[in-house]
């Protein structure tokens, strides 16, 4: 039997009727049409479905939608826009951190969590943070470079904002 669940996704509050066993990833994709969150394995192995819940990267295939009620959720669609990319999106583009792009939303969301808690990570810290995200195309070198570059872009932006 479906029940109403109120989710705050990318700053917008919405109520949807879902089965209590519905996974957040399916609600995001099928009910809210936020298809940037990918389903790669449905077993919490690949990281393609990663979103930010209450400030932390979470694999949305491991969370019931009802568990996310009342917590802010950010998906890749909430990270930037076509006209104003988020620094992580910009860095992935500039540093060629994607090929097919399937893993990219999850990588960016995981990197966002890392950079929100550690604004100047080492290469080792970046690699450790991304351990739960799989990429079959790039070999991770450009992804790590993109995260490192994004960190510098974010720090530069913060400095510029402090001077304004």
Residue ranges and their predicted role:
Residues 1-164:
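Signature of N-terminal electron-transfer/Fe-S-associated modules in redox systems
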């Amino acid at each position: 039997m479906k029940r109403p669940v109120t989710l705050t996704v990318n700053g917008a509050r919405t109520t949807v009727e879902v089965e209590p066993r519905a996974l957040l990833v399916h609600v995001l994709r099928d009910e809210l049409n936020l298809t940037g969150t990918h389903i790669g394995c449905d077993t919490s192995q690949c990281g393609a479905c990663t979103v930010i819940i209450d400030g932390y990267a979470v694999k949305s295939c491991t969370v019931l939608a009802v568990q996310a009620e009342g917590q802010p959720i950010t998906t890749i669609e909430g990270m930037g826009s076509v006209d104003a990319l988020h620094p992580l999106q910009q860095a992935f583009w500039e540093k060629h951190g994607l090929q097919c792009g399937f893993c990219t939303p999850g990588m960016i969301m995981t990197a966002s969590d890392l950079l929100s808690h550690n604004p100047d990570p080492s290469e080792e810290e970046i690699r450790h943070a991304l351990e739960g995200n799989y990429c079959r195309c790039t070999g991770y070198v450009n992804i790590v470079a993109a995260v490192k570059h994004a960190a510098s872009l974010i720090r530069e932006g913060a400095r510029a904002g402090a001077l304004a």
